[in-house]
Amino acid sequence: MLAAMFGGHALFTISDKTFDRMVEANNGRTGYHIHVSEGMNDVYDSLQNYGRRPIQRLQDHGILGDKTILGHCIHVNTAEMEIIQHTNTMVVNNPESNMGNAIGICPVIQLHKRGILLGMGTDAYTNDMLESIKVALCSQRSQNCLPNVGWCEVTDMLFRNNAKIGEKYFPATLGVLKAGAAADIIVMDYKPFTPFSDENIDCLLYTSPSP
């Protein structure tokens, strides 16, 4: 299966004129992928040069929508979250990249509460998505100063929402093992020291080393 998006880098490298040309060239055929508010420099640049916060600027140019993916969204305020929510725009969290670059933590809990479709990404920082679960969980608990939050949101991002995002571009059912769905299988060298069941899957994912 092949599908395409219209990729832009980040707001601080794209002028208003370029945004308008992107929308004209795309002509509504697909969504956009762009890094947004990954660091505070993105916010400062947008305010200084365009007088608008990043999400507001994207809305002004018609970039947002239900097939657009915003990477990172670390430094977004309440008004920007509302815009993302009302335009049904998607957000992809890249926890290891964000922590490695020391640029902040995506407000996953707050975005999730608004019903925003959140996916799990890597921004090419790692190829170990199970390790990303642990990093995302620890970062959310640290950010919110609560040791009992984040698990449902983080696992949903990887195991449910990534498939939902993919289904917006590919004409197939993804992320499930059933007749008619696209093959979506990984093979792991599992050594059954303990039973593997739906009753202890949370513990196994959180405490086991990645394959």
Give each language-model segment a name.
Residues 206-211:
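Conserved small/polar residues in nucleotide/adenosyl-binding loops
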Residues 16-17, 44-45, 104, 131-133, ...:
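Short, well-ordered secondary-structure micro-motifs
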Residues 1-90, 101-118:
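Histidine/acidic residue-rich metal-binding segments in metalloenzymes
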Residues 60-63, 67, 107-192:
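His/Asp/Glu-enriched, well-ordered alpha-helical/loop segment
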Residues 38, 95-100, 123-125:
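Short, acidic/turn-prone active-site loops that include or flank metal/cofactor-
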Residues 194-205:
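Short, surface-exposed loop/helix-turn segments at secondary-structure junctions
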Residues 69-70, 95-99, 165:
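Short, flexible loop segments at the rims of nucleotide/cofactor-binding pockets, characterized by
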